[in-house]
Amino acid sequence: MEYLDFEEPIKELEEQYSKACNIGEESEVDVTATCKQIEKKLKEKKKEIYKNLTPWQRVQLSRHPNRPYTLDYINAICGDTFLELHGDRNVKDDKAMIGGLGKIDDQSFMFVGQQKGYNTKTRQYRNFGMANPEGYRKALRLMKSAEKFGVPVVCFVDTPGAYPGLEAEERGQGEAIARNILEMTRLKVPIFVVIIGEGASGGALGIGVGDKVMMLENTWYSVISPESCSSILWRSWEYKERAAEALKLTATDMKKQKLIDEIVKEPLGGAHTNREEIFNTVKSSISNAYSEFKNLSQAELVEKRMGKYLDMGVFKG
């Protein structure tokens, strides 16, 4: 288990608890009362820390190396019904953007999302979750296929941004993202977006338009990362905490500004502390969202979605 800097008090108490339990197992000393006392302190400390997280600490949690990624959610939710589909039919198959068909109960869904790696090798293979233009074009191809067959779409967002390399720009990174945003606003099937980690810039927006946009409790969604914002405004990454506060990037901030529709509660300590619980919660959220939109006609669906986005950012005096 890896710990973030603000989780050090929890780490210390967990080590104390582990040592006390080991002493009890290896000797005849009764440490039951001590273990219970430490366990009580541990619960109180966890509540104290996680109920008062700063925006920057939530950013840190969203990047936790043990946090579940897109394929973890899809495999847990769909089981062996998931069939991955590949390629944009033009350039190549972008490994940073995955997608395919799967079932939740008896209902088929088209799943799309950015995928990160678990170690150095797989992180390079997945390009750290930063998709190229062909990744966004693959995502659009899958969404258009879903529209053709009347299958609802689920997008899992978890990216530090679209890949900013020269080759990506040469192949039309900006156009690919813009095209996705345009097409998603008028797609004639329900679209549900779940932000499961980082939601950075146009890289997130490229698969982020939906009838219902949900954010996990410890995720963020912003035009720029706190570090990049800090380096632009203050010429240093040292002010990233201040930048995170100013950007209003947390799920609570997004809900308050009506830029998302729902906050999905995470287990205490983050999604990685109880994977089964967060998988079941996300599955229920998707199923509930589908129940809400499944009876709308195609015209009503598109009109409602367009109306939602046209209302964003409108000043009312």
Curated annotation (Swiss-Prot):
<dbReference type="InterPro" id="IPR011763">
    <property type="entry name" value="COA_CT_C"/>
</dbReference>
<dbReference type="InterPro" id="IPR029045">
    <property type="entry name" value="ClpP/crotonase-like_dom_sf"/>
</dbReference>
<dbReference type="Pfam" id="PF03255">
    <property type="entry name" value="ACCA"/>
</dbReference>
<dbReference type="GO" id="GO:0016743">
    <property type="term" value="F:carboxyl- or carbamoyltransferase activity"/>
</dbReference>
<dbReference type="GO" id="GO:2001295">
    <property type="term" value="P:malonyl-CoA biosynthetic process"/>
</dbReference>
<keyword id="KW-0067">ATP-binding</keyword>
<keyword id="KW-0275">Fatty acid biosynthesis</keyword>
<keyword id="KW-0547">Nucleotide-binding</keyword>
<protein>
    <recommendedName>
        <fullName>Acetyl-coenzyme A carboxylase carboxyl transferase subunit alpha</fullName>
        <ecNumber>2.1.3.15</ecNumber>
    </recommendedName>
</protein>
<keyword id="KW-0276">Fatty acid metabolism</keyword>
<keyword id="KW-0444">Lipid biosynthesis</keyword>
<comment type="function">
    <text>Component of the acetyl coenzyme A carboxylase (ACC) complex. First, biotin carboxylase catalyzes the carboxylation of biotin on its carrier protein (BCCP) and then the CO(2) group is transferred by the carboxyltransferase to acetyl-CoA to form malonyl-CoA.</text>
</comment>
<comment type="similarity">
    <text>Belongs to the AccA family.</text>
</comment>
<keyword id="KW-0443">Lipid metabolism</keyword>
<dbReference type="GO" id="GO:0003989">
    <property type="term" value="F:acetyl-CoA carboxylase activity"/>
</dbReference>
<dbReference type="GO" id="GO:0005524">
    <property type="term" value="F:ATP binding"/>
</dbReference>
<keyword id="KW-0808">Transferase</keyword>
<dbReference type="InterPro" id="IPR001095">
    <property type="entry name" value="Acetyl_CoA_COase_a_su"/>
</dbReference>
<keyword id="KW-0963">Cytoplasm</keyword>
<feature type="domain" description="CoA carboxyltransferase C-terminal">
    <location>
        <begin position="37"/>
        <end position="292"/>
    </location>
</feature>
<dbReference type="GO" id="GO:0006633">
    <property type="term" value="P:fatty acid biosynthetic process"/>
</dbReference>
<comment type="subunit">
    <text>Acetyl-CoA carboxylase is a heterohexamer composed of biotin carboxyl carrier protein (AccB), biotin carboxylase (AccC) and two subunits each of ACCase subunit alpha (AccA) and ACCase subunit beta (AccD).</text>
</comment>
<dbReference type="GO" id="GO:0009317">
    <property type="term" value="C:acetyl-CoA carboxylase complex"/>
</dbReference>
<comment type="pathway">
    <text>Lipid metabolism; malonyl-CoA biosynthesis; malonyl-CoA from acetyl-CoA: step 1/1.</text>
</comment>
